[in-house]
A protein has these predicted regions:
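Catalytic cores of Mg2+-dependent Asp-rich isoprenoid enzymes
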Residues: 1-99, 105, 109-264
Length: 264
């Protein structure tokens, strides 16, 4: 399937006639908004990693994956919303990563029952956990809780750091993006409230919580940019690693911000 998608992407970024309506529509979008091929190609690479069943030994490996399946979406959306400065694109990339980290933390049990583990494997193994045995019979363990806790902390830093980027978006776009970021961050809060157990349960937000978040997002759209100071602190600090998020997304952001016209 993905080989076919690669060929279709090549065709979109060529000058050859296109017969399919999806390809024609996507070519129109990438040309109108100057979306470089590197961005959707990175998304397809992340999907290929999923198809291969790839695991992630280190936190840095997991960020490389999150860039491909999360940051790419944020960057493409930001380009379509008319912003292509490097700072706003970097914030969008980090927001995409934050949402992907939240997804991973929410779906630990669901993924495990399909034989998949996205949490960084080396720290789990070094703590004495036998990953293959655990995947054969998933159950909540302190090592899993600790890994989820660390990832959610990083996700929260990324959500906070994305605020200024959202404030730089067109006013009509801000409420939806802010609402999405708040809803995903709230999923992280629900996981914390359950003692980080996303093996035996799946976190969700109530209708009342969703409505309250939508109201907060609407207020955010009218607030001045100065109301949202940049969040301090690097991501990945708990592991002693450098700022993994911005480093991991740097190439993607550079390609998107420097690409101005044409389809390839």
């Amino acid at each position: 399937v993905l080989v076919g998608l690669d060929r279709r992407l090549d065709a979109v970024y060529s000058d050859a006639p296109l017969s399919g309506p999806v390809e024609r529509a996507f070519r129109s979008v990438v040309r109108e908004y100057a979306i470089p091929r590197d961005v959707p190609a990175a998304l397809l690479e992340g999907l290929r990693w999923d198809e291969e069943g790839r695991g992630y030994e280190e936190l840095s490996d997991l960020y490389d994956y999150a860039v491909r399946v999360g940051s790419t979406v944020g960057v493409m959306m930001t380009l379509v919303m008319g912003r292509r400065d490097a700072e706003t694109l970097a914030d969008a990339a980090e927001l995409g990563m934050a949402m992907q980290l939240t997804n991973i933390c929410r779906d630990v049990g669901e993924d495990a029952r399909r034989g998949r583990l996205y949490l960084p494997a080396r720290p789990l193994s070094e703590s004495g956990m036998h990953i293959e045995d655990w995947l054969a019979s998933p159950a909540m363990r302190p090592e899993i809780a600790n890994s989820i806790s660390l990832l959610l902390d990083d996700a929260d830093r990324l959500y906070a750091r994305s605020w200024k980027g959202i404030a730089r978006l067109p006013s009509q776009s801000r409420p939806a993006i802010r609402a999405a970021s708040l809803l995903y961050a709230e999923i992280g809060n629900e996981i914390r409230s359950a003692g980080f157990d996303s093996v035996s349960r799946r976190a969700w937000t109530s209708r009342g919580t969703k409505l309250a978040i939508l109201a907060r997002a609407a207020l955010f759209a009218r607030a001045p940019r100065s109301a949202f100071p940049a969040a301090a602190g690097s991501v990945g600090g708990a592991t002693g690693l450098p700022d993994l998020a911005r480093q991991a997304a740097a190439g993607l952001v550079r390609a998107a911000s420097n690409f101005r016209s044409g389809a390839g």
